[in-house]
């Protein structure tokens, strides 16, 4: 495994650890998810470029589209929760309520 791939996988693992450890605020969870999507995008792009597999060249673009949709939904949820409850603490949310 090359050093570049190790760095990208380390970035993914650090983002995953941040997502698992810092779950108190919704904004920090969204930032960790974006870090994971960015490292997956770079990993997919480098893998496709190094393997010369041109049929899968649309995969990183599709991953970026899903990442943009995830960011838009996450930010709209953050705005809605902040306006409703006045804070972005995840512990204050009860998902079983209607």
Swiss-Prot record:
- One GO CC term on file: mitochondrial inner membrane
GO biological processes: ATP synthesis coupled electron transport
* Compartments it resides in: Mitochondrion inner membrane
- Name the reaction it catalyses: a ubiquinone + NADH + 5 H(+)(in) = a ubiquinol + NAD(+) + 4 H(+)(out)
Which spans of this chain does the record mark as coiled coil?
none
Spans through the membrane: 1-21, 29-49, 61-81
Enzymatic class:
translocase
Q: Does the keyword Repeat apply?
A: no
Molecular function in Gene Ontology: NADH dehydrogenase (ubiquinone) activity
Q: Which InterPro entries match?
A: NADH_UbQ_OxRdtase_chain4L/K, NUOK/Mnh_C1-like
EC annotation?
7.1.1.2
Topology in the lipid bilayer is annotated as: Multi-pass membrane protein
Tell me which UniProt keywords the record has, alphabetically: Electron transport, Membrane, Mitochondrion, Mitochondrion inner membrane, NAD, Respiratory chain, Translocase, Transmembrane, Transmembrane helix, Transport, Ubiquinone
Pfam families the UniProt entry points to: Oxidored_q2 (PF00420)
Q: Any idea what job this protein has?
A: Core subunit of the mitochondrial membrane respiratory chain NADH dehydrogenase (Complex I) which catalyzes electron transfer from NADH through the respiratory chain, using ubiquinone as an electron acceptor. Part of the enzyme membrane arm which is embedded in the lipid bilayer and involved in proton translocation.
Its quaternary structure? Core subunit of respiratory chain NADH dehydrogenase (Complex I) which is composed of 45 different subunits.
Which family, according to UniProt? Answer: Belongs to the complex I subunit 4L family.
Q: What is this protein called?
A: NADH-ubiquinone oxidoreductase chain 4L
Record organism:
Muntiacus vuquangensis (Giant muntjac)
Task: Tell me the lineage of the source organism.
Answer: Eukaryota, Metazoa, Chordata, Craniata, Vertebrata
Report the gene name.
MT-ND4L
């Amino acid at each position: 495994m090359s050093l570049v791939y190790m760095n990208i996988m380390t970035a993914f693992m650090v983002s995953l650890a941040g997502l698992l450890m810092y779950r108190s605020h919704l904004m920090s969870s969204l930032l960790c998810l974006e870090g994971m999507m960015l490292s997956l995008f770079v990993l997919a792009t480098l893998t496709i470029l190094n393997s010369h597999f041109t049929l899968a060249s649309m995969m990183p673009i599709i991953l970026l589209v899903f990442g943009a949709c995830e960011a838009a939904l996450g930010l709209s949820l953050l705005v809605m929760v902040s306006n409703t409850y006045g804070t972005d603490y995840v512990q204050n949310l009860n998902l079983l309520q209607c």
